[in-house]
Amino acid sequence: MQYVESLFMPWNIDALVDGFTEDCVVRFGTVPEFRGREALHAFFAARSAKQKGYRLKKQFRTLVNDTLTNVWAGEWEDADTGVRMRGSGVEVWVMRGGRIALWEAAFNTGRADEVSSVADVLR
């Protein structure tokens, strides 16, 4: 997990993408499912442009056969607005040949200076 964290701080997009299979499948929150390293590279490039000063902490949770789970928390500055943001979530990685073949992620984000209620999240 620490190695993966290091690839986000600062962003090392080529190394991140190298950790995935050529035919990887990504299901990331409400982003429409996409496939392959080219689309993954574009996804990380878009995120790195938007998430200035990204700081990430991942914690390993489970490993069963070829499936690994982790939870994460992160903070960044929104590059467009300058607002400090935070996020947290859970990820499931299905591995093949030492690389991620399927990446599924669910997460919540919000302003770092605001506390969200259940009602806020459900809007």
Q: Locations of the language-model features?
A:
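An acidic, carboxylate-rich microenvironment
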Residues: 15, 38-39
